[in-house]
């Protein structure tokens, strides 16, 4: 699969461990691709839930996906600052149809004031039993929660204000071309 280029639009598909489609984002603009990572932006992007419900994202959000980390990061740019939503998820896979990953329920939310919250622990435990997550998978996900928290605490990558500013500025330049 040829990597998308800056300014291209891609679809993102989130699946569950059992292979069922969870959520789809249409028309995410690609800002940068490397061998292992894709940075994009959603801004008033159409989202379709597995039950057919549809909604549109409200504010610009820089999205970060990596082939070696078991999480993806959404930096939501709001008037009162940047908040983050981080999905514990498989590394992404890219094919002609979409960027795809498996969502593993656990999420970390960082509010504009810096407060961090681990979300959906009960859902993770329920799906772990129902979908038979292996002990190895459970270990990998919990280790990557630690890696993610380290990134957050140290302002690494998407958690750096400069990172968000650079990629938002690039998005505005591309949008206005």
Swiss-Prot record:
List cofactor names only. Answer: Mg(2+)
Active site annotation, chain numbering: 23
Please indicate if the UniProt record lists Cell membrane as a keyword.
no
Top-level enzyme category: hydrolase
Q: Which reaction does it catalyse?
A: a ribonucleoside 5'-triphosphate + H2O = a ribonucleoside 5'-diphosphate + phosphate + H(+); a ribonucleoside 5'-diphosphate + H2O = a ribonucleoside 5'-phosphate + phosphate + H(+)
Query: Which residues are involved in binding Mg(2+) 1?
Result: 87, 103, 107
The UniProt similarity line reads: Belongs to the Ntdp family.
Name the UniProt record assigns to this protein: Nucleoside triphosphate/diphosphate phosphatase
Q: What is the lineage of its organism?
A: Bacteria, Bacillati, Bacillota, Bacilli, Lactobacillales
């Amino acid at each position: 699969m040829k990597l998308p280029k800056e300014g291209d639009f891609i679809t993102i598909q989130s699946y569950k461990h059992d292979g069922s489609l969870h959520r789809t984002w249409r028309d995410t603009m690609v800002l940068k691709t490397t061998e292992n990572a894709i940075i994009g932006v959603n801004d008033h992007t159409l989202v379709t839930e597995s039950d057919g419900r549809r909604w549109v994202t409200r504010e610009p959000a820089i999205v970060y996906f990596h082939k070696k980390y078991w999480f993806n990061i959404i930096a939501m740019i709001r008037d009162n600052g940047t908040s983050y939503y981080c999905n514990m998820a498989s590394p992404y896979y890219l094919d002609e149809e979409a960027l795809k990953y498996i969502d593993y329920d656990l999420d970390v939310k960082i509010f504009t004031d810096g407060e961090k919250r681990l979300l959906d622990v009960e859902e993770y435990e329920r799906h772990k039993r129902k979908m038979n997550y292996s002990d190895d998978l459970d270990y990998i996900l919990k280790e990557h929660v630690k890696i993610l928290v380290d990134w957050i605490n140290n302002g690494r990558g998407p958690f750096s204000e400069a990172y968000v500013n650079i990629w938002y500025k690039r998005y505005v330049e591309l949008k206005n071309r």
